[in-house]
């Protein structure tokens, strides 16, 4: 794997978190994370975040919490999709680039050509990508090979046959002959890219997948279509849908989308949510970017993560993340 971005913990994986923090498997904030304290100097300017739709609500919560300490800061959050973050960072038209996936080599190369060094991808939260069905759907679980056979036209994961109907998954009665209505994201979305790589084994989506403009729209579509299936971040779950337990391979036990299984690495579609940063090695960040990252990776900022339905990072991860942009942990 090309490690051309300056990423902090993605190389060791989310499972490594279980050994570096004191939160265990619960969705709790690591008590070793300090409470954010206002900086002594002046912090002002425009805080503009361009990128992930999945992270849109979360980034807005961070900005809102940050402004309580620095009311003069102006904020703007544009959730256009993760693909919009790298060019905005490269061109200098944003302060941070939220992304729900890693940068592609071509995106990193474009940044390096302009600036002479790679961007930094700071892990700021943990997400579980979920497969949703209608709340009345009795499906017990899916292997990733079955997910691939449902959503992909290639079946790169090794499934012998295409899965088209609920009966193909063993459902009886009213479900048996009903086609599975598929909902997903478009190609600008980091969620689309992550699902394509990890659930479709880098295969191609079927043309019958109905692309939605955002994560919330996918969940709403599944909630209103009894015979639907869709994928989105776990933070968009509502009472009108069910999250399907997943197995990493055929014949393995189904794993619930539970925080303890994200931390342990047992849930097969866990991922980091990143803030992309333009940081020249050996230099100090300006006060606005420095303090925003300190807030995000504090107990306050990780409280926002939990509030929005995602999983907080540990103090050890936060310390390494801050160090990657030259910030000493409190």
Segments from the language model and where they lie:
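Basic/polar N-terminal segments that are highly enriched at the extreme N-terminus
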Residues: 1-2, 24-26
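Bacterial N-terminal signal peptides that target proteins for export
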Residues: 2-12
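Bacterial N-terminal signal peptides
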Residues: 11-21
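Flexible loop/hinge segments at secondary-structure junctions
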Residues: 26-330
């Amino acid at each position: 794997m090309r490690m051309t971005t300056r990423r902090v913990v993605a190389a060791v994986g989310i499972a490594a978190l279980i050994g570096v923090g004191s939160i265990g498997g619960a969705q709790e904030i690591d008590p070793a994370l300090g409470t954010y304290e206002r900086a002594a100097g002046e912090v002002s300017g425009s805080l503009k975040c361009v990128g992930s739709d999945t992270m849109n609500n979360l980034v807005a919560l961070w900005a809102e919490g940050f402004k309580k300490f620095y009311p003069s800061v102006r904020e703007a959050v544009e959730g256009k999709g993760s693909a919009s973050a790298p060019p905005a960072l490269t061109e200098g038209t944003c302060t941070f680039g939220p992304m729900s996936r890693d940068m592609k080599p071509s995106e990193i190369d474009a940044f390096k050509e302009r600036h002479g060094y790679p961007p930094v991808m700071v892990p700021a939260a943990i997400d579980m990508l979920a497969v949703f069905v209608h709340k009345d759907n009795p499906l017990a679980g899916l292997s990733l090979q079955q997910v691939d056979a449902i959503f992909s036209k290639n079946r790169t994961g090794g499934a012998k046959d295409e899965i088209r109907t609920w009966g193909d998954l063993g459902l009886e009665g009213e479900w048996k002959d009903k086609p599975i209505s598929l909902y997903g994201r478009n190609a600008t979305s980091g969620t689309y890219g992550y699902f394509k790589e990890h659930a479709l084994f880098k295969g191609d989506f079927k043309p019958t997948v109905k692309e939605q403009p955002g994560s919330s729209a996918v969940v709403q579509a599944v909630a209103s279509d009894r015979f639907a299936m869709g994928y989105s971040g776990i933070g968009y779950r509502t009472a009108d849908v069910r999250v399907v337990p997943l197995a990493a391979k055929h014949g393995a036990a189904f794993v619930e989308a539970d925080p303890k299984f994200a931390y342990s690495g047992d849930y097969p579609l866990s991922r980091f949510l990143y803030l992309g940063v333009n940081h020249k090695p050996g230099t100090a960040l300006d006060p606005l970017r420095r303090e925003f990252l300190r807030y995000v990776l504090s107990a306050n900022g990780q409280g926002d993560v939990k509030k929005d339905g995602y999983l907080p990072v540990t103090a050890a991860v936060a310390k390494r993340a801050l160090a990657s942009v030259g910030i000493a942990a409190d």
